[in-house]
Curated annotation (Swiss-Prot):
Family (UniProt): Belongs to the UPF0053 family.
Annotated coiled-coil segments of the chain: none
Protein name from the UniProt record: UPF0053 protein MT1890
Residue ranges constituting the CNNM transmembrane domain according to the UniProt record: 2-205
Main location: membrane
Locations listed in the record: Cell membrane
Organism: Mycobacterium tuberculosis (strain CDC 1551 / Oshkosh)
InterPro entries per record: CBS_dom, CBS_dom_sf, CNNM, FAD-bd_PCMH-like_sf, FAD-bd_PCMH_sub2, Ion_transp-like_CBS, Transptr-assoc_dom, UPF0053_domain
Lineage, highest ranks first: Bacteria, Bacillati, Actinomycetota, Actinomycetes, Mycobacteriales
Domain CBS: 224-285, 286-346
GO molecular function: flavin adenine dinucleotide binding
Amino acid sequence: MNLTDTVATILAILALTAGTGVFVAAEFSLTALDRSTVEANARGGTSRDRFIQRAHHRLSFQLSGAQLGISITTLATGYLTEPLVAELPHPGLVAVGMSDRVADGLITFFALVIVTSLSMVFGELVPKYLAVARPLRTARSVVAGQVLFSLLLTPAIRLTNGAANWIVRRLGIEPAEELRSARTPQELVSLVRSSARSGALDDATAWLMRRSLQFGALTAEELMTPRSKIVALQTDDTIADLVAAAAASGFSRFPVVEGDLDATVGIVHVKQVFEVPPGDRAHTLLTTVAEPVAVVPSTLDGDAVMAQVRASALQTAMVVDEYGGTAGMVTLEDLIEEIVGDVRDEHDDATPDVVAAGNGWRVSGLLRIDEVASATGYRAPDGPYETISGLVLRELGHIPVAGETVELTALDQDGLPDDSMRWLATVIQMDGRRIDLLELIKMGGHADPGSGRGR
C-alpha cells in the first residue's frame, strides 16, 4: 500500500467514524426527546424541526435505521483497518529478536485496540453524551441525514425489523413499535421524589404533587367520614333542629334520614337556614329544603368520587358498601384535604390528628394506615383493616378499654417484617366501642418485659 492509498484509507476511516457518530447521535437524541416538545417545535419551528417530528412519528423505524447505519459504518471501519494495520512496519520488534509472526500479531493487536478505542470514543460515546445533554440541538443537526439514510435503505430496515419482531413474538412478547411516552401515576410519583432529592423541586411542591398523583388510587371508603362520625337529622325535624345540630356538632352538612342512615332521603346545609324566615324555622320541615344526595360505592376510585361530588348540589355524596348499607359520607372538603392536608376552620376540632408525645405520637383512631405511616414512619402489614384502630382491634381480638397495650409488627422499606423494630400501641381514649385516641411508641427490637399483647 503506497502513501496515497494509506492517506486515503485513514481519511475513509475517519469519515466512517464520523458517520457512526451521526447515527449514534440520531438514535439517542430521538429517544431523549419528549413527544410534546417535538410537536410544539414542529408547529412553530423550522424545517429541521419538522424532520424531527417526522422521525419521531416513526421512531421504531428510525431507530432500526440508525442501528443499521452503525453496523455498516463499524464493519466498514474494520474492513479498512485490517489491510492498513498489515502494512505497519515493525523493525524494532524484529530487532529485539521477536519473530515476524509474533511481531505481526502484536502490532496488529495494539493497532486494532487503538483504532477500536478511537472509534468507540469519537464514534459512540462522545455523540451519545452530546445527544443526551442537548437532545434538541443534536437532533436538529443529524436527524435530516438519518431520515434520508432510512429512506434509501427502507427494504433492508423492514427486513431486519420483520425478522426481529418474528423472533420476539416467538418468545411470547408483542413488539412495541414506539417508545411509551406516557407515565403511570406510580412512575410520576417516583420522578417527583427523585426531583425533590436532587433539589429540582422544593419539598412542599413535591409533597403536594405526590399527594395529587396518589389521590386517584384511593377509594371512596378511604376518603369518607365513617358512619359512626356522621350526625343525621330525621325527616320530621325542622329548620330549628338544623340550627341546633350545627351549633352542637360544628358540622355544616347533615343527611336527612327516615330512621337511620340506610334510608337517607336527602342532604341539608346550614346555609339553607337563611332561606327560611326566622319566624317559620320552628315549623318548616327539613324535607322541604333537602337536596337529593349522590350515592357512590365504597370501591369507587378517588377521581370518580371527585367528579360525582363536584356535580352534586351540596358537594356531598353518601358512600354505600357492597351490601347496600351506608358506610359513610364524603364531602368536597374531605377530598381537598386528602390532597392539600387538613383545612381547618372555626368549626373544626383544634386538636390535630397526630401529636408528638414524648417518645411517640398520639394519633386519632380514624387515621388510615397510610396516613399513620406518613406522619410517624410506622408501616403496618396488610390486613382486613383501613385505619390504625382497625389494626389494633385485630391484634387485641376484643373491644379494649382505655389503658390497654398491644405490640405491633412493623414492615421495612421493602415491605418485609422488620424484627429489629417494634411498635407499642396504647389505647388512650374510647368512643363507645370505637378506639378514639391511641399512643404509638417506637421501640428497638422487642417490647420490654412489662409490655405485651393485650395487656
